[in-house]
Amino acid sequence: MKRIFLTFLLLLTSFSVFAFDFGGILSTTSYVQDSVSNLSFNQYVESSLWMRANLGKNTTLTSDIFYSFNGDFANEAELQAGKESTFINKLDLSSLKLTSKFNLENNSSLNLSLGRFLINDFSGVVFAQKLDALALNFVTENAIVNFYTGYTGLLNQYTVSMFSPKFVPDANPFYTFATPYIVANVSVKLPVLFASQNLGFELYTALDAKDFSYNRIYSGISFDGPIYKSLYYALTSTFQFNLGTYPEKSNFGNLTKAEISWFSGVKSFILSANATYLSDSFTPITSTDVLSDGSDLDSVLKTGIFASVKPIDKLFVSLGSDFVFDVAENNSIQDYKGFQYSAQLRYQLFDDVLLNFSASQIFYNQQNPAYQNQEPYLNLKAHIRISF
């Protein structure tokens, strides 16, 4: 009895020293997509458990374990073509991150992160995913310097999507290793450099860890800041250089994103105009959809407007539209591809229940020979998330 009491007392003492919190998320997502006459249905059921422990004043450990069941149901046309419905179970350690902060002189600090966590480049496009990495973040009054290096080959191919022209993953249940890249990044941000403007530089490398034949170097620059009162801009441009032996159409590529946003200050209303340009040979590390039909980021110019508002505290509404153009092999604007729209409604039903509905559709230019017989592509999504 005395041992049980001492053990219980020790546990209470440990939790008082190391603050501990945990919780979970249950969600279901339904997709209806493809041309209106050939719609397909996908169902995702997901659950995750997370925990956070403060291991002292400046050290934190966080983790997130994820399970998902995905059903891709073949429609009638796909069944006639020989395709069957597929069902995939996914199990993943979404994140495991140890973070420590070291306070230095002159209001400077050094932050160390180790484990598996999300990484984003300036554009949010080139590399926007999880990474098993070591990261250093040095912060001063005049500059922010970031460095990280990591490996993608231990990630779950079912939960990340990376571009590789030759990697074929194993068809293992639950977990299969992803495309193996050795990734490194160094970036410098100069906040409020002049006239409240922010400037940033970054350099990325992605080396093919399998045979070093498909290698990438990315160099990026970013500008952002106020133009006048509530009017702001953001500009990023990333240049890609191909260094491997894998045959390429071109050894150079470019991604440029520009946005001007007006913050009204009323009901969180934001109105923005944006443009995204990708040259013919640009290939990011993370495979990201750029159009409503699921097209990858490749050889496209997209320009449009976007608006969002919170008419009441728990409701978020957004609406956007874009004109899309193909980019030719010489990187000039080639042909008008089509027009797309997107809409989203997100409602916080209760503190722990979130409802999210979205719709998007692209209408192809029927006068363009490349899309003469393509029907409009529709994408509908309904998502319910319960937190506990």
What is the predicted role of each segment?
Residues 1-4:
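Positively charged n-region of N-terminal signal peptides that target proteins for export
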Residues 33-45, 53-112, 118-128, 243-250, ...:
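Surface-exposed loop and membrane-interface regions of Gram-negative outer-membrane beta-barrel proteins
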Residues 374-388:
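Outer-membrane beta-barrel "beta-signal"
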